[in-house]
């Protein structure tokens, strides 16, 4: 294919054209803050384009059973066994999607359900225009619970890394 696509449960979704400057600036700042924290730790941060292959939990992880391939804006993976030359096979521990008007519905619906079902422990939705970050965490029932919606002047604690927070003023600066 000439265009970038994501495959979600066997259904093809066109990805947005190359992200704009603001999206890239926010993504860069988030990756930078995570990378400083993750230095010399077992978890690694990756940003799009980076394939995350999510197998059907009822089937094997063989390529012919992969019906979902997504490229989250940012993902953190703490299990090195999930990493291969093609990306990540299995659920990352943490995912961030930076929404645009073209992707907001998919990120709030299809990807929300997909990441919840796949076992992504923490999911952030960043809204550049409103300067908000919505944080969901898996609860004991393996369902997402809304932790909070954070504004640009707040720090966002990273649930999977106790004691570490992202500074939103820096993320939304500029």
Placement of each model-derived feature along the sequence:
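Gly/Pro/Ser/Thr-rich low-complexity, intrinsically disordered segments predominantly at protein N-termini
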Residues: 1-174
């Amino acid at each position: 294919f000439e265009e970038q696509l994501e495959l979600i449960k066997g259904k093809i979704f066109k990805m947005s054209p190359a992200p704009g400057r603001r999206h890239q600036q926010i993504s860069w700042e988030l990756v930078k803050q995570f990378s400083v924290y993750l230095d010399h730790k077992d978890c690694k941060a990756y940003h799009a384009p980076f394939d995350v292959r999510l197998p059907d939990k009822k089937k094997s992880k063989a390529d012919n059973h992969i019906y979902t391939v997504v490229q989250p804006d940012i993902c953190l993976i703490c299990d090195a066994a999930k990493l291969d030359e093609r990306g990540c096979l299995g659920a990352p521990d943490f995912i961030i999607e930076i929404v645009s008007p073209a992707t907001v519905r998919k990120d709030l619906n299809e990807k929300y359900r997909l990441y919840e079902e796949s076992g992504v422990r923490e999911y952030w939705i960043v809204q550049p225009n409103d300067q908000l970050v919505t944080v969901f965490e898996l609860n004991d029932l393996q369902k997402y619970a809304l932790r909070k919606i954070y504004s640009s002047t707040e720090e966002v604690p990273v649930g999977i890394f106790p004691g570490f927070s992202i500074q939103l003023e820096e993320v939304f600066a500029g």
